[in-house]
């Protein structure tokens, strides 16, 4: 069944989506409609709710299964490693629950996965505070998840996170110093886990690509058009930038390289297995955040899942001491697989 987009660009709902004809470097199509590519498009699959009907509607072709595997907390791992937060890197390497570790500090007692509310607080703080987020935003995130906490308590959680993860906090300042150096015309290096070279307006990544800050400048006083602080040109506008935001840019870029390298290894293994041949599909069909999704013949699903987990536990050549891990699933639909 093929549906189309009307002239008013309204999506017509189709009962079944087939994820056969797509690939990791091609655009994702559902029933012939263009809905995703690795760089984003007008419509994407980045925020489908878990257990939702849309996930369930993405099904494998007859005789095939979907294998989905995500690189567990890749941003948190890369952030701890890049900043040199050694104790957190050790927790990741040993397979400890880092959410429970932080929650234990917050509540002053041992927190386990059985303590769902307390672990949720630890998880929200771990995921939300690595890039300089303040207590007010933390409070909102906790409230949205059903944990209503006072101003003072949220301020205390932020202080606990920052004192516990001092190397991450320090890196915000180092990133701010890098901006200052860039504006002054200097070059240098940044990072602990790996050293990233920078020069005015750009930072080089391990894969040879750059994060760019065109026309970067510092304004000592705000005016009608610009805020005080650092900013760079983005299309026709000035975009504010600061140390913690720079770190977020760097960590997300590094995490993307890790996941795309993992995806490349998986795609190569599927090709060696036979790829798309003799009526069989063996193909990476989708990436969502830190997740790789493939379609394979039913009889190869368990074997493929094991292969994906093996490939996604390989440490990058440029980050041999970065502890990576993953979790996979299998299903007839995307919803069943994850």
PLM regions with names:
Residues 120-122, 285-291, 321-323:
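Short Gly/Ser/Thr- and Asp/Glu-enriched loop/turn motifs at secondary-structure junctions
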Residues 83, 113-132:
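Amphipathic, charged-and-aliphatic alpha-helical interface segments
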Residues 133-138, 259, 326:
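Helix-rich, typically C-terminal accessory recognition domains appended to large enzymatic cores
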């Amino acid at each position: 069944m093929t549906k189309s987009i009307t002239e008013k660009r309204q999506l017509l709902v189709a009962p079944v989506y087939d994820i056969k004809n797509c690939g990791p470097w091609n655009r994702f199509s559902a029933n012939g409609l263009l809905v995703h590519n690795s760089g984003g498009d007008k419509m994407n699959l980045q925020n489908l709710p878990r257990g939702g009907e849309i996930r369930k509607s993405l099904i494998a072709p007859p005789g095939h299964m979907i294998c989905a595997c995500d690189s567990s907390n890749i941003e948190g791992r890369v952030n701890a490693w890049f900043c040199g937060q050694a104790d957190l890197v050790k927790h990741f390497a040993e397979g400890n629950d880092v959410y429970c570790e932080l929650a234990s500090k917050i509540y002053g007692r041992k927190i386990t996965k059985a303590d769902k509310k307390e672990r949720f607080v630890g998880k929200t703080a771990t995921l939300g505070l690595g890039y300089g987020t303040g207590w007010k935003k933390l409070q909102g995130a906790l409230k949205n998840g059903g944990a209503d906490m006072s101003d003072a308590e949220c301020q205390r959680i932020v202080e606990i996170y920052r004192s516990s993860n001092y190397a991450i906090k320090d890196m915000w300042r180092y990133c701010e110093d890098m901006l200052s150096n860039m504006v002054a015309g200097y070059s240098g290096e940044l990072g602990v886990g790996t050293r990233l070279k920078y020069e005015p307006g750009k930072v080089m990544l391990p894969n040879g690509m750059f994060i760019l800050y065109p026309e970067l400048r510092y304004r000592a006083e705000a005016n009608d058009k610009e805020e005080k602080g650092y900013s760079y040109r983005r299309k026709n506008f000035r975009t504010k930038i600061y140390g913690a935001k720079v770190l977020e840019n760097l960590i997300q870029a590094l995490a993307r390289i890790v996941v795309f390298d993992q995806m490349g290894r998986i795609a190569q293994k599927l090709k060696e297995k036979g790829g798309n041949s003799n009526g069989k599909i063996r193909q990476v069909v989708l990436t969502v955040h830190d997740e790789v999704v493939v379609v394979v013949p039913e009889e190869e699903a368990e074997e493929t899942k094991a292969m994906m987990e093996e490939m996604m536990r390989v440490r990058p050549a440029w980050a041999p001491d970065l502890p990576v891990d993953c979790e996979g699933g299998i299903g007839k639909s995307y919803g069943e697989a994850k």
